[in-house]
Amino acid sequence: MKESFGRLMIDIEGAALSSNDIELIENPHVGGLILFERNFVSKNQLIDLCAQIKSVKKNILVSIDQEGGRVQRLRQEFTNLPSMQTLGDIAEKTKNFSLLNDVGWLMASELIATGIDISFAPVIDVDRQTSSIIGCRSFSEIPEKVSKFAHEFINGMNKAGMQATGKHFPGHGSIEEDSHLTLPIDNRSLAQLMDHDLIPYFDLKDALSAIMCAHILFPKIDKTNAGFSPHWIQEILKKKIGFKGVIFSDDLSMKGASGFSYTDRVRISLDAGCDMVLICNNREGAIEAIKYMENNNISTSGSIASMMPKKKLSWKELEASNERNRIIKILQNIEEN
């Protein structure tokens, strides 16, 4: 029988669980927890925190954003990872595309050894050098290169036992605005997106285990924010593209998702086709979401179980690994040059 997970992902404030955190995690509707820099003091502390979380609830997906470059929540005692743009440029210049595989493996291995199940990675937005929020987080400005480089990175993650999440569907690379602060608007047509931003989603639909939806409005395609849109999620992502994996909302506390109560944000996201919704940095919003789920008998999800790591690894084993030491030396040479 497939394990069931609650469909809400929340955050915690500190470096250890509070009694309030434990009470929330124990709720059957909470099936995920996302970590931030504030939750990290040291590697051993983080290992203990992840173990504490799993002792409260076995069926909980522990996540983080450990992309590399400027979006890397864990730095001290973890390998400093280059941005995906830097990584793609080096791989292209040297024709050493296995480097992408290596870094995907290393990132995933360090997290799994710590007790973290997934990094929300890779970013498969196509960089058009207009986005304040994407930029160097993207592998390339060429869609086919994004697909090629991301596939190598995903293979590395999978080799370590971690499932990959592509983001931010349908594409954030052409947007100037930051959806954390406002609802970005993209006036391109679906045909234009099919020829550009959506190419990696078609190419990687079978390689990705999950996709995270963006809070962006495409008024020429649908009047609803893509993250809330059945047209985008059901008709385009699932039917037209053929994606069959897990679908995450982006953070519902972002300004790009505002204009509704948290109850409505959760309801609309789930109705649109999201398997799991994220509410970060707003405990009142998370509690409101739980009450909505309780009052409406929202079912748990069996599909989330597919995101759990397929391998186990300890830091002792990882630090003794010739593979890790080899990759770290390569990355050190990149930093020096």
Where in this protein do the model-derived segments appear?
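Second-shell residues forming the walls of enzyme active-site clefts
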Residues: I10, R38-I53, Q72, H151-N158, ...
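Glycine-rich anion/phosphate-binding loops
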Residues: V41-D48, A91-S109, E141-F149, A191-D195
